[in-house]
Design a protein with these regions (language model features):
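Active-site beta-strand termini and strand-to-loop segments that position acidic
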Residues: 25, 34-38, 133-134, 153-157
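Hydrophobic residues in well-ordered beta-strands that form the structural core
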Residues: 45, 101-105, 161-162, 202
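Active-site-proximal beta-strand elements of phosphoester/diester hydrolases
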Residues: 6-15, 43-46, 137-144, 159-162
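Metallo-beta-lactamase
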Residues: 63, 117, 137-142, 147-207
Length: 207
């Protein structure tokens, strides 16, 4: 696969999509689009805040959505109620287009509880599974710590890390399901094989 074939976009909620959404501007979540330009297929990582806006970006780029990937179950990444606000996400996305939602197996029940989607909408994965989009392979790496089923995605020497790893630290471990020991293991062991020259793409603009 050549770099010209890989489709990779980083969208900032509150700026690139969900413009004017107060919650999106406060949480500064990143949404990622990954696909194969040759086949025109793409998946979205953490489609919160503005599903229609995400589809509009894909349409402008002549890409078709074929799936969604969740780094973890928190509403600012997959939709649901948070701090008194209702955030749109995978449930609303599935109302617009029928695609599978890829989740880490340990977190499937949490995604259904938070978003209201059914288990039939989910594809549950183990660490090391690969989601293929055209000729683009995305490796799923289970990285518990922020939540029990947090996962990172590795594609073309790029690590889409969700809330596991940021530019200046790791995700919080003091929320329900957080585990500092698991986070330490995820960073020092599970992600240790990621090349030093890999580019990090975190879940929030925190740095």
């Amino acid at each position: 696969m050549t770099d010209d074939r890989l489709y990779f976009r980083q969208l900032l909620a509150g700026r690139d999509i969900a413009v004017g959404d107060m919650m999106a501007r406060q949480m500064v979540n990143f949404v990622y689009l990954i696909g194969d330009r040759a086949s025109g297929e793409a998946v979205v990582v953490d489609p919160a805040y503005d599903p229609q806006g995400i589809l509009d970006v894909l349409a402008e780029d002549d890409m078709t959505l074929t799936g969604a990937l969740a780094t973890h179950y928190h509403p600012d990444h997959v939709g649901g109620d948070m701090m008194g606000f209702s955030i749109t996400g995978v449930a609303e996305l599935l109302e617009l287009t029928s695609v599978p939602v890829h989740v880490q197996d340990d977190e499937g029940h949490l995604v259904t509880r938070v978003t209201g989607v059914t288990d039939a909408n989910l594809v549950r994965h183990a660490s090391g599974d690969v989601v293929r989009v055209g000729a683009v392979d995305i490796e799923l790496i289970h990285t518990p710590g922020h939540t029990p089923g947090s996962q990172c995605f590795f594609v073309d020497n790029r690590l889409v890390a969700g809330d596991t790893l940021f530019l200046e630290g790791c995700g919080r471990t003091d929320l329900p399901g957080g585990d500092p020991r698991a986070m330490y293991e995820s960073i020092t062991q599970r992600l240790a094989r990621i090349p030093d020259d890999a580019i990090l793409f975190p879940g929030h603009l925190y740095s």
